[in-house]
Amino acid sequence: ASASYLRARLLRKDYDGVKSFIPESVLTILLEEIQTGRAPCSLTALERPILAALRNLSPEELAKLPDVSEGLEYRIASAVRKTTSLDQLFAEIKTKRYTHARIRRIIVSAFLQMACDYNSPTPPYLRVLGWNDKGTEILRPARRTASLPIVMRGGDLKKLAEGALTIAQLGSRAEDLYSLSSPEIQPCGLDFTSSAARQRS
């Protein structure tokens, strides 16, 4: 099943409909997140803030977003003035050249105030989200020899060099805004305080 299919099921609270598609260990965590109000998250929950952010941007500012070229900024600016929902906005902007997924990425970039300056072919650091005993064997030597910093705890982000720290702060801001889309709004700064999840055998 696709991620879109699973998200749609979760938003409809059809939890039985996703059980057969995800591992039991993941399902346990997912149900805990749902119970605490941290899931499921939905872009629709951010509809008004996103539309507000877009209405404050000029075509010149839109042109600085990643993936915007060939005058697309004017098409976006025009669509923003005419539409009253994200679905309408995406439909108004979409063309054969600019797919729905690409348009959605651009709109989210605008909401996050993410300019082309942040576009880099290589990441400034590696973020470990979770690991098990086998992962420990790999990570221990890798942290000494890797060409990029390996981040396992939120506190590690504060030790990054200036350029990498800028990207980490952008990621943290995205996390803060993303948390507004959960059923229960979460506090800011979780990206700098959370740690990778460890699965013990």
Predicted regions and their residues:
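Active-site cores that bind ATP or allylic diphosphates and position pyrophosphate for catalysis
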Residues: 1-201
